[in-house]
Amino acid sequence: HVGTTDNLMSCEEWDNECGKVYKGMIDAGVESVMIGHIRLPEYQRKLKPGIKDNEIMPATIAPELLQGLLREQLGFNGLIITDATHMVGLTSQIRREDMIPTTIAAGCDMILYYRDKDEDTQALKTGLEKGILTMERLDEAVTRVLAFKAMLKLHTKKANGTLIPPAEGLSVIGCDEH
C-alpha cells in the first residue's frame, strides 16, 4: 500500500453489499473482526454530520465506523482488531505515538503488531494523560481481549501444555501444500 484507500460506495450500496456480508457473519456468531485502514466517506458523513473532508480517517481510527456502524448498527459485540499498524494506510494519517491510544479510543480492542512494546505502552499511558483515551475505554478493550482468550480456552491450553501444537501439527506450516 502507498496510501489510505477510500471505499466510495454510497451508504445504500455498502448496506446492500458489504453490510449484508458483515451482518450475516455477525448473526452467525463471528467472534472477531479485523479492521482495515480504509475510509468510508459516505457512511462517515452520514454517521457524523458536518464532518470535514480532512477529518475522514481510516476505519481503524474512526469511532463513527467502529462504534456507530459496526457495534451499534450491525450489532457486533466481539473483539475488534486493527490490521497491521505499520501499514502506510494508517501511518500516513497519524503519528504512531497518537495512533496507539487513538485506535483504542476509536473502538479497536487489540492492536496488531507493535514496533517497540515499551514505546507503545508509553504511548497508551501518554494517551490516557492527554485525554485521547479514557480508562473506561481501555478497561473495556482489555475485558474484550481477556474474554476472547477465555473463549479460546488459552488459559487451560497453556496450563495443560496444548497451547502450542505438537511437532507434526507444526510441520504443515510452510509446507508445499500450503
Regions found by a protein language model. Give the residues of each.
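Mid-to-C-terminal alpha-helical segments outside catalytic/metal-binding sites
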Residues: 129-157
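A short C-terminal boundary segment appended to hydrolase-like catalytic domains
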Residues: 152-177
